[in-house]
Amino acid sequence: MEFKLKHKDGMARVCEITTAHSTFLTPVFMPVGTVGAVKSLDANDMKNELDAKIILANTYHMYLRPTSKVVKDFGGLHGFTKFDRSFLTDSGGFQAFSLSKNSKHFNEGIEFKSHIDGSHHLFTPKSVLDTQYDFNSDIMMILDDLVALPATKERVKISVDRTILWAKEAITYHKSMQNKGIGIGQNIFGIIQGGTDYEERKRCALSLNEMPFDGLAIGGLSVGEENALMYETVQNLNPYLDENRPRYLMGVGTPEDLVENVERGVDMFDCVMPTRNARNGTFFTSFGKFNIKKAEFINDHEAIDPACSCYTCRNFSRGYLNHLFKAKELTFFRLASLHNLHYYLELARKMREAILNNSFTQFKRNFYHLRGK
């Protein structure tokens, strides 16, 4: 991976990241392709309609089905999905924690039951990397020990101890595998845990900073805490993060979350919110969000967002989309997902532009003004 810090405006940053499959600027939003596809969209949509440079796929889901061996047989994620730009794969730890009713965390790894057939599995720091080697993802995430918030101080300390232990095991294993010719061209990110405990977050960040990860992620936020506490936690971490590595806030979030955390120095984001909300009829726009199922849109000839240049807004009216949603027409999911993802990707582009122009503060003011805030 090549990383260049191009410009700063306060804490907000524009960076250039080059992997084996694409070059992209940050702040960047990564659409989530949980099972190897962004829901209702294909590789052509991602490249030609949205111009996404990097997307996320989920290790837990693709490990269980179709299995990493099947994906490897197709030439990795790029050959399997035909998306030939960058892939980031998470470790699967969050899904093992959240989808399995009886997951167990111990120092060797995470034991869990498949949500598909109830079979028993064990994720370890080494095994999740082996799975991601099969995927040939451009950026691999290490296994970390996530805790739901609120959590006791003792449980947070155990989480940080375990995450540091697993990080050491993962980076040592990755370097040894690269020496054997495996994982060449693949990059590895560490994950900082610690809940909202300042000292534990600091301890975890300082420990991971000493390890030769290609980037660092902030995990374990947006899992039950108030937004203000999330923003404070990210801001407090800033002095302890290496300026010359990417910073990735995992699983976050709303448009407001992106703006607030870019202001606090975050480079990379992912979230299922744009596509999940699309399937429920909720659209993100420059003036806020609204749900298309309301009767007021039946005869509305306007585009979802007159200021938007996405395929959906260029071609279809609110009235038509209201009809498709109420008719449960599958076409709706694609059109709504295209719009919401375009909105998120365009928001990231506008933030990059504002940072480069030293006008991020004004951008943020206008962002909230359009929402009546």
UniProtKB/Swiss-Prot annotation:
The keyword Glycosyltransferase applies. It comes from Campylobacter jejuni subsp. jejuni serotype O:23/36 (strain 81-176). Pathway: tRNA modification; tRNA-queuosine biosynthesis. Catalyzes the base-exchange of a guanine (G) residue with the queuine precursor 7-aminomethyl-7-deazaguanine (PreQ1) at position 34 (anticodon wobble position) in tRNAs with GU(N) anticodons (tRNA-Asp, -Asn, -His and -Tyr). Catalysis occurs through a double-displacement mechanism. The nucleophile active site attacks the C1' of nucleotide 34 to detach the guanine base from the RNA, forming a covalent enzyme-RNA intermediate. The proton acceptor active site deprotonates the incoming PreQ1, allowing a nucleophilic attack on the C1' of the ribose to form the product. Residues 251-257, 275-279 are annotated as: RNA binding. Keywords: Glycosyltransferase, Metal-binding, Queuosine biosynthesis, Transferase, tRNA processing, Zinc. The active site is at D90 (proton acceptor), D270 (nucleophile). GO terms for cellular component: cytosol. Belongs to the queuine tRNA-ribosyltransferase family. The lineage of its organism: Bacteria, Pseudomonadati, Campylobacterota, Epsilonproteobacteria, Campylobacterales. Gene3D superfamilies: Queuine tRNA-ribosyltransferase-like (3.20.20.105). Disulfide bonds: none annotated. InterPro entries: TGT, TGT-like_sf, tRNA_ribo_trans-like. It holds the Pfam family TGT. Its EC number is 2.4.2.29. One of its GO terms (biological process) is tRNA-guanine transglycosylation. Its cofactor is Zn(2+). It catalyses: 7-aminomethyl-7-carbaguanine + guanosine(34) in tRNA = 7-aminomethyl-7-carbaguanosine(34) in tRNA + guanine. The keyword Hydrolase does not apply. This is Queuine tRNA-ribosyltransferase. Zn(2+) binds at C308, C310, C313, H339. Binds 1 zinc ion per subunit. Substrate binds at D90, S91, G92, G93, F94, D144, Q193, G220.
